[in-house]
Regions:
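Cysteine endopeptidase catalytic domains of the caspase/legumain-like
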Residues: 1-302
Length: 302
């Protein structure tokens, strides 16, 4: 009997040992599963962060290519040789330089210099016909400009300016150009106007009642940039012996516009800052002005 009791106790002890071993194994398995679940949770959070970053980049890229659906086309004019108001020194070269830079950036260029009234209106009409829906459009004008009754006009080389009505007939309305681009369905229009915003007729004693270019309002999908603030002179040169052949605004613009992956907002912040400093260095004031209704980003060199 005693022998049988000993055997039974041994069996029960082995049973307890097996149960404890199994429990320990189950605990280890549970801990491993818990660790795996925690690792999976962290991996899920990491993947979610990556997905959010990818979605943010996609959204940014979509904004950057908002205006990339169409072609890139530019209308560039530089008028130096005015017949009845003061001649300019650098407008023609400014237009040529900007035209070359835009060509390098992938734009189809329509470049014109020293246009009289007839030629300027014909060139504008031809350019309007080229613009297609979704195009990125850049309009660059270097020359004289004036405003009458709050309306901005870009002046051809043979402008007379004997009276306001004559200027309205002979000059080109800036707003008309912008309206034409909108009518043609341009995806984005950037107007760069490197013109004095004082009165070019003042020294000639003409009583036209006009003053420098007026503040304006861009419509959706357009950005308008004046090289100088209202009533300011856009400097051709910093001083008579200035060795740089381009006007102050254009020389800075040329340096900034071809920096890769630089948005127009960043370009213009840099341009404005440097133009202000350059003008200040010779005791002048010139502050580029921007009127912006663009949607998304524009890059000269994406």
């Amino acid at each position: 009997m005693e022998r049988l009791k000993d055997q039974l106790n041994q069996v029960n002890a082995q049973k307890n040992d097996i149960t404890q071993g199994e429990l320990a194994q189950l605990r280890r398995q549970a801990e491993q599963k818990e660790q795996a679940a925690e690792a999976a949770k962290k991996e899920m959070e990491r993947l979610k962060d990556q997905l959010n970053q990818v979605n943010a980049q996609i959204k940014k890229d979509e904004n950057q290519i908002t205006y990339r659906a169409g072609r890139r086309i530019a209308f560039v004019v530089g008028n130096n040789h005015y017949q009845n108001v003061s001649r300019l020194e650098t407008a023609k070269l400014d237009a040529i330089s900007v035209g070359n830079a835009l060509k390098e950036a992938g734009f189809k260029i329509n470049l014109h210099t020293d246009l009289n009234e007839k030629s300027m209106k014909l060139a504008m009409r031809d350019f309007k016909a080229q613009v297609q829906k979704g195009d990125e459009v850049v309009v660059f004008f270097a020359g004289h400009g004036v405003q009458i009754g709050g309306v901005n006009y870009l002046l051809p080389t043979d402008i007379q300016g004997d009276n306001e009505e004559q200027i309205r007939d002979e000059a080109i309305q800036l707003q008309r150009i912008l309206d034409d681009m909108q009518d043609r369905g341009a995806g984005f229009t950037l107007a760069l106007i490197d013109a004095c915003r004082d009165n070019p007729f003042r020294q000639q004693g003409r009583s036209i009642g006009g003053r420098g270019l007026a503040p304006t309002t861009a419509t959706t999908g357009q950005m308008i940039i004046f090289s100088a603030g209202s009533g300011q002179q856009a400097l051709d040169k910093l001083y008579p012996t200035d060795p740089v052949p381009n006007g102050v605004f254009t020389r800075v613009l040329l340096r900034e516009m071809l920096k890769p992956k630089t948005s127009i907002d960043r370009v213009m912040r840099n341009v404005r800052q440097d133009v202000v400093q350059l003008a200040k260095s010779v005791g002048k004031e010139q502050t580029p002005a921007l009127y912006d209704q663009a949607v998304g980003d524009f890059y000269f060199k994406p």
